[in-house]
Structure formats: C-alpha cells, structure tokens
Amino acid sequence: FIASRNLIPAARFAHTLEGDDAEIAKAVEAGKKQFVGFELPGRTLGVIGLGAIGVQVANAALGLGLNVVGFDPGISVEHAWHLSAEVERADSMEEVFRRADILTVHVPLIPATRGLVSTQRLALMKETAVLLNFARAEIVDTDAVVAALDEGTLRGYVCDFPSTQVHKHPKCISLPHLGASTKEAERNCAIMAADSLRGFLEDGQVHNSVNFPEAVMA
C-alpha cells in the first residue's frame, strides 16, 4: 500500500506532461522521485487497539511480511484467542510509537482516546514513519500531525477523514470515509445489529460494546 499510494497523483502528473518523447522522458526522470515509497516486508507495523478490527489488521499484516507489534491493555479473551502468536505484545503504547515504521490506530472514540495521538507521542516516532488513522478523526491531534509533517519528524499521514488541514497537504493522503460503503458491508452491519440486540435480550451479552459494562439489562 505504501508503495502504491501514489498511483493517482502519479497519473495526474503524467497527464501534465507535454512535448515530444525525449522531453517527456526527461520530465519523468526529473519528477518521479516525488512518488517513491517503500516496500512492506521486514517493516514493523504498530497496532494500537486489538479489538475485532485491530486483530484482523495485525494478522493480515503478518501475511504481507510485516513484523507486527500491538498494544491493548483491555484486550478481551475472545480477541486474544484470534490474535496470531506471531504478533508481539508491547509493554506500553509508547513502545509501539517508538518502534513502528507504520502505525495504525483502531480504538473507539471515548474521552480516554480523544487526542491519543498527541504531540508528545508523535515525538517518539521515527522520522521515516507513516501514521494511518481509519478509526475516528478526533483520536488524532491533527494540528500536531501537521506540525510533525511540516517539521520533517513524520513521513506521512493517511486517513479517511478529509479536512482543510490535511486535504491538500503534500504529505497527507485523505480518502473519503468509505469503509462501510458497500452493499455487503451494509448488510453485515444490519446482521450484526440484529445479532447484538438478540444476544442482549436473550442473555444480557453485548459484543463489541464501546461503553461496556454500562450497557446493562433494565
């Protein structure tokens, strides 16, 4: 993904080229460095939050040749069972920030996670690291991220929460929030909602609740 993320801007660059073949070839050589990425095998993916999504991301990353280190002090027994033994458990969140070449956050937005990716934690990251946020916009202090990008202490930021701060930043890729924008995803969401309601009514169980144990049977 990191190496292919520039396909669209690279295609736009190609459309701006004018002149004969020789001139175009020179322009390509002069401009292609701006689209250089890096390959995933051997890199370290840091995962903050090992819930249902975080576990799937961590396990999938192993198949791409990444080393994976994760942190979640409240990981459930169910999610721990599904987490590959090859995923290294960090002793602290700060350890993940320090070690990651690519850092991805998968936590719900609650008071404790608002601004979780802060100036102080960003300062721990490698200058070559890339931050991914496909959870909630407010989990990341966007001002701090933009400052880190401008200062060269963070390589890139990828999110699906376009804002005026990151939309046109040269080191940011902001996508539409499309994670559930398929017919299959919408159907699965409806099924999960129905299953959750039935489970709560039948035995008081609520899976994937972000406010558990406050969700109690009246």
Language model features with spans:
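Phosphate-binding beta-alpha-beta segment of Rossmann-like dinucleotide-binding domains, i.e.
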Residues: 1-44, 202-209
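Short, flexible hinge/linker loops that cap or flank conserved catalytic cores
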Residues: 34-41, 62, 123-124, 166
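Glycine-rich Rossmann-fold phosphate-binding loop(s) that bind the pyrophosphate
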Residues: 43, 50-51
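N-terminal Rossmann-fold NAD(P) dinucleotide-binding loop
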Residues: 54-55
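Gly/Ala-rich phosphate-binding loop of Rossmann-like dinucleotide-binding domains
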Residues: 58, 62, 149-150
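Residues at the starts of beta-strands that form the adenosine-phosphate
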Residues: 63-67
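Rossmann-like adenosine-cofactor binding region
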Residues: 69, 73-166, 181
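NAD(P)-dependent dehydrogenase/reductase Rossmann-like domain
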Residues: 169, 178-218
